[in-house]
Amino acid sequence: MDSKESLTPGREENPSSVLAQERGDVMDFYKTLRGGATVKVSASSPSLAVASQSDSKQRRLLVDFPKGSVSNAQQPDLSKAVSLSMGLYMGETETKVMGNDLGFPQQGQISLSSGETDLKLLEESIANLNRSTSVPENPKSSASTAVSAAPTEKEFPKTHSDVSSEQQHLKGQTGTNGGNVKLYTTDQSTFDILQDLEFSSGSPGKETNESPWRSDLLIDENCLLSPLAGEDDSFLLEGNSNEDCKPLILPDTKPKIKDNGDLVLSSPSNVTLPQVKTEKEDFIELCTPGVIKQEKLGTVYCQASFPGANIIGNKMSAISVHGVSTSGGQMYHYDMNTASLSQQQDQKPIFNVIPPIPVGSENWNRCQGSGDDNLTSLGTLNFPGRTVFSNGYSSPSMRPDVSSPPSSSSTATTGPPPKLCLVCSDEASGCHYGVLTCGSCKVFFKRAVEGQHNYLCAGRNDCIIDKIRRKNCPACRYRKCLQAGMNLEARKTKKKIKGIQQATTGVSQETSENPGNKTIVPATLPQLTPTLVSLLEVIEPEVLYAGYDSSVPDSTWRIMTTLNMLGGRQVIAAVKWAKAIPGFRNLHLDDQMTLLQYSWMFLMAFALGWRSYRQSSANLLCFAPDLIINEQRMTLPCMYDQCKHMLYVSSELHRLQVSYEEYLCMKTLLLLSSVPKDGLKSQELFDEIRMTYIKELGKAIVKREGNSSQNWQRFYQLTKLLDSMHEVVENLLNYCFQTFLDKTMSIEFPEMLAEIITNQIPKYSNGNIKKLLFHQK
């Protein structure tokens, strides 16, 4: 028996037997074929040929395959059968095949689906292959058909190593005698693997003028590749039976078997070719054509320490001259002397970590500001005329990589933090109308005041006003302008103050000459902070249109229905207005609803009286710009009595010549004029808010009358008007409840108004309402 075992299939029906040494181990190639279940193959199994040879450094699985006889008939690739017989089929879909970069012949490959093939079918297909293969006595016979462009035997000794894993024999019987199969086509009988290796001019082959494998560079025992001098050497499979080998995954094609057991082969042109996948990693440079599991080591450079290593082209090849690399990091070497490598799984070369380039490290250290001298405290920036403060942004002087100017000019390069607009938080352009704002808010406020726009928020009067959303809600923006203290009078006041300061400067100069004089200062300065009255001006609802068609003859039913529909929309506007009143939303939610249910008629009647007073001098009732009740319409049935009560309000406003500020304060007090007998849930807060607006009414009176002795008298008259509103509203509500309950009148009510009336009727009938009066009757 030779030192290696040979697999010699016969031409009989039964496959050839497998010979093994006594010390030979049976390797488990089907470790992961069935989800981890181990399938041991004995020496008598006809499906595998396994031989073991004891060696001090490695164990080799030696399998002899014929070099192949030349035949004119082109034969497909046999990698399927050999891969299966060697245990390389495991069903992984992530396997990477790399070989075309090194000049391997592109052969078609046939694979079996692991989900559709069982072990019996596998053994039967291998047995068919074994019957059709034969081992020629002279392995050199295949060299007779080499093409003229191939290297000579002297330069490249014929070996059977490089492509043994991808080129195997399939059954090629023709007739009864059968026929020989060839490994390659006519143009692929021999191939030059050195053409794609791109060796430099000083390659071993050119220096020795003989076979490149006989160089001392490759004979060194520390190298990965050993000289392939043995012409009769079978290709070797280096591996450990305990390794978790991930084999080559072939294209998923199910073999077709004839009735007589022959295997039907597909055309090589239709088979998917193996593709090369090169993975690149940052700052990793491989100096050996070995298989390396690459890992990032940070921003450092790695240099391999293999002697005699060459870069194959400019690519980081993950495959050697002989072998297949898988995604798991393992590689199967053929005809390779790996005695210098440790028999460990996922073997990696030892890298020498080279420090980073000094320039990069210096820049990094500078950017990081290492060193106490390069650090600048964020809270120790001093500016002329300012106290020490802490800022949260990085100025140029804080950056160590920027050369700091002399201390005398350092304050010129580092300015204070940018000033922000108090309205939208954009970068402020200056002090406009008494407030530090941007140019956009300045123009907006001027147009809003001069245009007398009555903005109404579509939300809850708490919209976010910033640089991006400042144009979404003009009502909230205008309110925020007033809250910030913007005032058109501030511009005039600023000019006055400037003139006074100039006069003061002139007087101070005279005072310096004559110490007996005293400096003249203004007695009072106008208040620039917003007041509650200014906020009430902002939130005042706009005038609504009734949509009444005056071309159609008037009728009581049509006018009353139109007024109810208009009243429903006015109630909705009143709810939004009440929620925008400062302090009202701080009340309990139930208290807010109760106050609105008790005061909705107060608000509508008082607003109607104000419009009638301002537009018609209390002679007409101006419900809306398109619905004005004149004397002719007042004569309609059931109209005069109600119009008489409403005309009383407008006539009192006209008699007292109520100002707009007084009207706004009185209207707010009417919202707070009726409460339940049991009180509110937040009664103390309610009393505080009500007293606040009573004081605002007094301020409005003082603003109108000045420091006059008539202020208290006017306050008495205005509060008397507020008390009289209870009687007016009571009469209006009685008529409203009557028309609501009397279905024969067929007067329509909007849904929200009908809900309020339904909830309010039992409270009025039970007397569960407490009137808050200023004067005793």
Curated annotation (Swiss-Prot):
Changing residue 494 to A: Decrease in acetylation and in repression of its transcriptional activity by CLOCK-BMAL1 heterodimer. Complete loss in acetylation and in repression of its transcriptional activity by CLOCK-BMAL1 heterodimer. GO terms for cellular component: centrosome; chromatin; cytoplasm; cytosol; membrane; mitochondrial matrix; nuclear speck; nucleoplasm. There is a cross-link at residues 277, 293, 703 (Glycyl lysine isopeptide (Lys-Gly) (interchain with G-Cter in SUMO)). There is a cross-link at residue 419 (Glycyl lysine isopeptide (Lys-Gly) (interchain with G-Cter in ubiquitin)). GO terms for biological process: adrenal gland development; apoptotic process; astrocyte differentiation; cell division; cellular response to dexamethasone stimulus; cellular response to glucocorticoid stimulus; cellular response to steroid hormone stimulus; cellular response to transforming growth factor beta stimulus. Changing residue 90 to I: Abolishes expression of C-type isoforms. GO terms for molecular function: core promoter sequence-specific DNA binding; DNA-binding transcription activator activity, RNA polymerase II-specific; DNA-binding transcription factor activity; DNA-binding transcription factor activity, RNA polymerase II-specific; DNA-binding transcription repressor activity, RNA polymerase II-specific; estrogen response element binding; Hsp90 protein binding; identical protein binding. Residues 1-420 are annotated as: Modulating. Pfam families: GCR, Hormone_recep, zf-C4. The modification Phosphoserine is found at residues 45, 113, 134, 141, 203, 211, 226, 267, 404. Changing residue 336 to I: Abolishes expression of D-type isoforms. Keywords: Acetylation, Apoptosis, Cell cycle, Cell division, Chromatin regulator, Chromosome, Chromosome partition, Cytoplasm, Cytoskeleton, Disease variant, DNA-binding, Isopeptide bond, Lipid-binding, Metal-binding, Methylation, Mitochondrion, Mitosis, Nucleus, Phosphoprotein, Pseudohermaphroditism, Receptor, RNA-binding, Steroid-binding, Transcription, Transcription regulation, Ubl conjugation, Zinc, Zinc-finger. Heteromultimeric cytoplasmic complex with HSP90AA1, HSPA1A/HSPA1B, and FKBP5 or another immunophilin such as PPID, STIP1, or the immunophilin homolog PPP5C. Upon ligand binding FKBP5 dissociates from the complex and FKBP4 takes its place, thereby linking the complex to dynein and mediating transport to the nucleus, where the complex dissociates. Probably forms a complex composed of chaperones HSP90 and HSP70, co-chaperones CDC37, PPP5C, TSC1 and client protein TSC2, CDK4, AKT, RAF1 and NR3C1; this complex does not contain co-chaperones STIP1/HOP and PTGES3/p23. Directly interacts with UNC45A. Belongs to the nuclear hormone receptor family. NR3 subfamily. This is Glucocorticoid receptor. It comes from Homo sapiens. The gene is NR3C1.
